């Protein structure tokens, strides 16, 4: 995926050994990782997080120090037309991965293990005319996508509280940058402008988003998993409202 491929390249460049699990839906593209595909520290497995047995097998075999969970259906408009896919991947898939992580953690002597759930500020709903979302902002999802991500956030925290799974959650604003799928807003605007086609306007055209460069986001993800406190939530934004 978009954020995941940028994160994998960063982690491999810093000497980490990576197992990359991806279902390779329409939004996945292995060409994003051609620069590291032959790296001995990198391994790719084509698998679906909705396959509970496969997740348990892969986690047990790889014996990770950290699990960084970025697998998700993420297009808001598609979630309106086909919400079932979002429920399955974002909620059931997260449940499966949490159970695989719990099984591994409880049978392992690895005291450095952590499950890092990467989420979105969409779970907070609309911000209003000013201010910022904070880690204390109440959840107010407005679409099947954001509702499914909110559900997955709560599942992760519940596994931390109920089973003692070492977890951390990060919620990010809108990412942009290399390898982003063409359906997203900035690639769509660029593509339409280059082709001389009308640029789509959403709502009354007054909506404002915070934009976060994907490589900056990846640095923030790395910071959270390296120094974040167990059980905490961290918002990652760009302070770049447009």
Give names to the regions the model predicted.
Residues 150, 175-188, 195-197, 202, ...:
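Glycine/proline-rich active-site loop of Rossmann-fold NAD(P)-dependent oxidoreductases
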Residues 169, 211, 241-242:
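Short aromatic/basic micro-patch
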Residues 1-175, 195, 215:
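N-terminal Rossmann-like NAD(P)+-binding domain of SDR-like oxidoreductases, especially those catalyzing
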Residues 122-124, 207, 241-242:
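Active-site/binding-pocket entry motifs
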Residues 54, 180, 211:
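Short acidic, gly/pro-rich beta-turn/loop elements at beta-sheet edges
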């Amino acid at each position: 995926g978009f954020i995941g491929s940028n994160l994998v390249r960063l982690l491999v460049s810093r000497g980490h050994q990576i197992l990359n699990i991806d279902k390779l839906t329409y939004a996945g593209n292995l060409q994003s990782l051609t620069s590291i595909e032959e790296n001995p520290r990198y391994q790719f497995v084509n698998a679906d997080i909705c396959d509970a047995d496969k997740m348990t097998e892969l986690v047990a075999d790889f014996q990770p120090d950290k699990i960084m969970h970025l697998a998700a259906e993420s297009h808001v408009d598609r979630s309106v037309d086909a919400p079932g896919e979002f429920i399955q991947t974002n909620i059931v898939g997260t449940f499966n991965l949490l159970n695989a992580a719990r099984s591994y953690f409880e049978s392992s002597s690895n005291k450095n293990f952590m499950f890092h759930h990467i989420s979105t500020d969409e779970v907070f709903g609309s911000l209003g005319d000013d201010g910022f979302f904070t880690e204390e902002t109440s959840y107010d999802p407005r679409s099947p996508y954001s509702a499914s991500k909110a559900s997955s956030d709560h599942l992760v925290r519940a596994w931390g509280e109920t089973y003692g799974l070492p977890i951390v959650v990060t919620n990010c604003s809108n990412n942009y940058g290399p390898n982003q799928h063409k359906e997203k807003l900035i690639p769509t605007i660029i593509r339409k402008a280059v082709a001389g086609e009308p640029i789509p306007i959403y709502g009354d055209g007054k909506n404002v988003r915070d934009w976060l460069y994907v490589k900056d986001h990846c640095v923030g993800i790395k910071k959270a998993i390296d120094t974040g406190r167990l059980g905490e939530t961290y918002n990652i934004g760009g302070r770049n409202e447009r």
